[in-house]
């Protein structure tokens, strides 16, 4: 009876194979064989030797303990004996790489460190039965404390997840199972974003169960295996040493690939039709004719991938794609050896297709880039938001976006750059301001030309603001050889650098122990100016019973119209908006005296605000209010105030 086995080691012209019954056999080596490959082992091909050879195999097994452990992991994945109740496997790559096993409720049932850094991170912490999102948040916090995550830059966390094969097969509705799993991953991303702020950007990707098997075979995380496959797709021959030793972001930067490139495709099947799979997927030799040449190379074909693929089932190839191995160097012809040459026509100029991933997009919740909200990598600038919004955290009106990075032309010639935006736009290429239409407008095309050289990367920056109603933004190019098109992600490379600081709501407050704003006692952030201290003054040990306060920061409005600002106070008060003094009554006023001043303001912009108040020993009281045609009179809320 033929067996299924995994190649443990190759020695000379022979391969040592461990079969499903955990026995070791030797078979003749064939082209394409490599360690870790699953093959058919016909009995008539097993090399029969005397007993001492079998003993030698046992000795060899001791010398290849690491490989044997890897094979045991494969057996655990491929056999029905793996842990019960497992819903999904999740690999997390920060710099440490960790493997989580979770149940249907999203609780951690096991956590395995995949490298030494990960072992150090989880030391002394109990994660079992903790919800996965909570466990990951805890790991991120530990990583921050240990300096693994730098809070002064963007840190990507790659979360690669595979639905358990048994769970998927037992589900009555596979489509529903996949949908629920995707919703689970979306929830993880949202939880981490909410808990960790904008310095940590979680990226989740769902892959077939076979990715877990291949990752185990190669002793890497699913995320790293995904990176390997992506780079191989674009022609990068990444070594196993690089894959294991470098951080994922270092690998991607080295080869000019953006993080978002990993998420453009839906991974519903392995990139190649013939990859190692479980015993339950083995194709019968009765159904697949096997010639003597490829008898040892027939491999299992996935028939139960978690996601439904529209592609036809793959047929086993004669020479399956090996796992992570270097491509052989071509052997030159021997000296004097006659070689035939065929004349070839003069090739056309080479088109320099890039390996970019898009531009860095900084999104702001107003029109003048002062209320930073989040950053992401946009594959290209081709947006038609209509009367919607780029993100739930951004209002549908009065927002702005700044895209930065580099652009790589395919040809050396004069390029025309086009913008189509509703509303304002500015475009710089190679430091030159090509388009400057910073005004509210319906969707309008503008263009300008500049000479560029093929293969050279030029700085590019596009700024855009949305005023009200419809919103759209597009960036295109054309040249003599380049037809007009949206600039593709392959020719765009995102910039890097620290994130803009997010605004803190409220106003910066300075408290003084006199009425002249000289004896500063302390500073703090006040949510709003709405105080009734009475005789319980905020400043103690006053020289003459007087104190004063200065509030400074920024203010924005919801509407574009004239606003009236009101102060209700029992001391002196002054108010500046946009450096204009609109209220000036610096004297001791009666109880709850009201003053007001007016100024025209535009929605979506921040204006400087300064308020000064002094108390002359009377019960202390001050409020800052506003009103307009559409704004009811109220205390200016914290959400419209921003501390310096």
Swiss-Prot record:
Residues 78-644 are extracellular. Disulfide bonds: none annotated. Its main location: membrane. Residues 1-56 are cytoplasmic. Coiled coil: none annotated. Residues 354-491, 502-640 form the PA14 domain. It is found in: Cell membrane. This is Anti-sigma-I factor RsgI3. It is a single-pass membrane protein. It comes from Acetivibrio thermocellus (strain ATCC 27405 / DSM 1237 / JCM 9322 / NBRC 103400 / NCIMB 10682 / NRRL B-4536 / VPI 7372) (Clostridium thermocellum).
């Amino acid at each position: 009876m033929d067996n299924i086995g995994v190649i443990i080691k190759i020695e000379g012209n022979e391969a040592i194979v461990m079969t499903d019954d955990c026995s070791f056999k030797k078979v003749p080596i064939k082209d394409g064989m490599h360690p870790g490959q699953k093959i058919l082992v016909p009995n008539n091909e097993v090399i029969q030797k005397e007993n001492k050879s079998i003993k030698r195999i046992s000795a060899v097994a001791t010398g290849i303990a690491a490989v044997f452990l890897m094979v045991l992991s494969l057996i655990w994945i491929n056999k029905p004996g793996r842990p019960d109740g497992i819903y999904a496997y999740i690999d997390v790559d920060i710099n440490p790489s960790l493997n989580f096993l979770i149940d249907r409720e999203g609780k951690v049932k096991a956590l395995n460190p995949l490298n030494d850094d990960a072992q150090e991170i989880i030391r002394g912490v109990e994660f079992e039965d903790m919800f996965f999102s909570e466990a990951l948040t805890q790991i991120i916090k530990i990583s921050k404390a240990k300096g693994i995550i730098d809070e002064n830059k963007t840190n990507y966390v790659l979360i690669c997840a595979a639905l358990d094969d048994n769970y998927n097969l037992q589900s009555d509705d596979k489509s529903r199972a996949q949908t629920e799993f995707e919703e689970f991953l979306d929830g993880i991303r949202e939880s981490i974003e909410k808990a960790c702020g904008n310095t940590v950007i979680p990226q989740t990707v769902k892959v077939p169960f076979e990715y877990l098997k291949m990752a185990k075979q190669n002793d890497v995380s699913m995320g790293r295996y995904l990176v390997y496959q992506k780079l191989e797709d674009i022609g990068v021959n990444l070594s196993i040493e690089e894959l294991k030793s470098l951080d994922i972001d270092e690998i991607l930067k080295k080869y000019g690939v953006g993080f978002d490139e990993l998420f453009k495709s839906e991974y519903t099947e392995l990139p190649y039709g013939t990859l190692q799979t479980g015993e339950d997927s083995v194709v019968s030799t009765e159904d697949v004719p096997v010639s003597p040449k490829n008898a040892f190379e027939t491999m299992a074909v996935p028939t139960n991938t978690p996601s439904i693929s529209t592609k036809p089932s793959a047929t086993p190839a004669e020479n399956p794609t090996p796992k992570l191995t270097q491509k052989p160097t071509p052997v030159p012809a021997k000296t004097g050896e006659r070689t035939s040459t065929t004349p070839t026509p003069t090739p056309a100029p080479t088109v320099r297709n890039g390996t970019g991933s898009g531009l860095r997009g900084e999104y702001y919740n107003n029109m003048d880039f002062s209320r930073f909200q989040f950053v992401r990598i946009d594959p290209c600038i081709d947006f038609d938001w209509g009367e919607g919004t780029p993100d739930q955290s951004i209002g549908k009106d009065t927002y702005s976006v700044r895209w930065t990075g580099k652009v790589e032309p395919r040809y050396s010639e004069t390029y025309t750059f086009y913008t189509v935006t509703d509303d304002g736009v500015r475009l710089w290429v190679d430091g030159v301001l090509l388009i400057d239409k910073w005004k509210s407008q319906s969707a309008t095309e503008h263009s300008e030309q500049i000479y560029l050289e093929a293969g050279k990367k030029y700085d590019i920056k596009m700024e855009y603001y949305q005023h009200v109603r419809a919103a759209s933004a597009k960036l295109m190019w054309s040249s003599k050889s380049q037809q007009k098109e949206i600039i593709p992600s392959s020719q765009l490379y995102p910039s890097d650098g620290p994130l803009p600081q997010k605004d803190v709501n409220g106003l910066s407050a300075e408290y003084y122990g006199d009425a002249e704003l000289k004896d500063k006692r302390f500073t703090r952030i006040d949510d709003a100016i709405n105080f009734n201290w009475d005789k319980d003054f905020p400043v103690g040990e006053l020289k003459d019973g007087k104190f004063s306060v200065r509030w400074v920061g920024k203010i924005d409005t919801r509407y574009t119209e004239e606003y009236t600002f009101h102060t209700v106070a029992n001391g002196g008060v002054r108010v500046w908006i946009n450096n204009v003094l609109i209220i000036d009554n610096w004297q001791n006023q009666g109880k709850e005296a009201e003053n007001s001043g007016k100024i025209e303001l535009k929605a979506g912009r921040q204006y400087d605000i300064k308020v000064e108040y002094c108390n002359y020993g009377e019960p202390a009281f001050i409020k800052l209010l506003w009103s307009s045609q559409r704004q009811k009179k109220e205390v200016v809320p914290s959400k419209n105030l921003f501390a310096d």
